[in-house]
Amino acid sequence: MKFFTKLLAVIAVYILFNNSNVNAQGCVAIRGNGSFQTMDHPMLDTTIASDKSWYLTASYRYFKSFRHFSGTAEQKQRQVLGNEVINHQSTIDLGITRNFDQFWSATVGLPYLINTRSSLYEHGGKERHSSYSHGIGDMRIVVNRWLFDSHKTHKGNIQVGLGMKLPTGNFNAQSTFYNVTPAVRPVDQSIQLGDGGTGIIAEVNGFLNFTSKFSGYTNLYYMANPRNVNGTRTYRETLRATLANEANSSVPDQFLARLGANYTFQGHNSALTVSGGMRLEGIPVYDLIGKSDGFRRPGYVLSAEPSLSYSLRKINFFANVPIAVKRDRTQSKTDKENSIATGTRVIGDAAFADYSINFGVSFKL
């Protein structure tokens, strides 16, 4: 019973961070959209769902993307030739959760992003230069409900959520580019601070206790972006005539799925929980609602995700490091259209990271 109440306590708080930080570790551009973490670890001796309470969560995420993939094939020559694109992205997430009773809660999250992108092709092709962006990202507001009464259900539970992603991040962030003469223009889609769309968020989170030490967790997340394009010029049309319909930035959907298991130590180490699981995140070729025109880099990353948590009475420290095991830059809408027009399979590329580093802390206020 004590283990269950601890586990239930952290779920609504720890759900705050991983999901919105669905950054897909690279040029498959899924930026942070408010706070979300995962249903991994126990914390606190009080049952979060049994009383009215506030929780504040802060987390940090970093990755460096530099390995180019076209489909699942790595373009190793990019690093040999020195023309790979290198993205550095840091995200600071702040989220606050209000628990109303044992069923209902609401979460508001807002990220702050700091991005650097180094390339040759955006700066004339001969010299490497960097572009930059920083500022708040897109906010998310989600209302969640547990399906079963935590006072009566002790083996497991399922939480469903519905919310919105608001376009609070700048989707036309600009930096200086060097093509013969310096010029200020929009940065690449992968380091834009927002996407300009009002998204519809749906999520399902669940856990199941196997024993007093072992439990399982799952998270399913989808954000539908009905807006088609956001008006931010990409300059893709200047690269090749076949990319003319990619001159405008698309507003893509996002998805995340996680499945794993937790082990909570006993005795003097009962505050420590370790977890392991798999994580799938990315953006689809076509959106669930509305058109899918403009430029996007669709694809996904499948990662192995070790994590740990250390819980005190009113505070929880957590960290995880998703390690990419499969990276796939899928055919975009433009790729498919050009494949039909030429009779030859066309597919673009994207840069991915090997791993990302995530850590944070949650407080009961």
Which residues are covered by each model-predicted region?
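Residues that define the transmembrane beta-barrel architecture of outer-membrane proteins
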Residues: 52, 88-92, 133-139, 156, ...
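Surface-exposed strand-loop-strand hairpins of Gram-negative outer-membrane beta-barrel proteins
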Residues: 28-30, 62-91, 190
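Short loop/turn motifs that connect adjacent beta-strands in outer-membrane beta-barrel proteins
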Residues: 25-28, 44-53, 65-67, 103, ...
